[in-house]
């Protein structure tokens, strides 16, 4: 375990080549604890995919939005080409976008005749008191947009562990919100009709119907895509970690949760590994390498049927096209430490 040299008796190739080669994949998620090199890995994987796919879209759902920093190029909520590539695009979206912004994006919505009385706002507040409904609708809106863009493969640079798997619960969240809104609409509908009728406003509480239609449309989108997420031919999840206790613990928890949702995961990227020379007198380097070796052995034992990719700790930050491309090469060509290690 002191090096990343491939042996002929290895059961699983220690690279992400199998992910790159799987042409049926449509959705690839890259996730892990904060600070483990998740964004670098997702950018580098997208670069490799761009070599073999017609069109690749890289999406950051991490509020920190590190894609712009990684490529040295500003990205926003609209997909744009990455400088130097003709088939790799990127976008950064806010998964916690305002629910009011989402509803305002509906077609043909004018001024809300209920807003002056606060009734519409009250019903929205009641419906959106369900935990996670803001995030669920934002994510659904992104998926709806992504589906219409027709990219061959989409790579998600996800938020740190803990937020990563929330999307799996979104269909249930939206169904709860829909049920609550429907109940409110049936209860208050007659009252709203009489109020609106006397004011000469829109008939039948139209803004509530629009809200229900909007949420139903998003729920259908997210339910459809979630079914694709559970198809191993279409979706896989790449875990990123470092060889330390907390990161390994988070990775194990994440893999168990992915498995419980029937989402394929068979690749782990272990970043920031030290390979000190045998003659090295750096006590800290040797001590840290010893610790990393212990956790690498645990990873090997726990995930013997996974592609475990070992990536070295680099002396410089991986930022910019050139450095990302070098890093990406190591995802498909196993890193071999210099002689004497």
UniProtKB/Swiss-Prot annotation:
It is an enzyme of class 3 (hydrolase). It holds the Pfam family ArsA_ATPase. One of its GO terms (biological process) is tail-anchored membrane protein insertion into ER membrane. SUPFAM superfamilies: P-loop containing nucleoside triphosphate hydrolases. The active site is at 62. Coiled coil: none annotated. It is found in: Cytoplasm; Endoplasmic reticulum. Its EC number is 3.6.-.-. Transmembrane segments: none annotated. Belongs to the arsA ATPase family. ATPase required for the post-translational delivery of tail-anchored (TA) proteins to the endoplasmic reticulum. Recognizes and selectively binds the transmembrane domain of TA proteins in the cytosol. This complex then targets to the endoplasmic reticulum by membrane-bound receptors, where the tail-anchored protein is released for insertion. This process is regulated by ATP binding and hydrolysis. ATP binding drives the homodimer towards the closed dimer state, facilitating recognition of newly synthesized TA membrane proteins. ATP hydrolysis is required for insertion. This is ATPase get3.
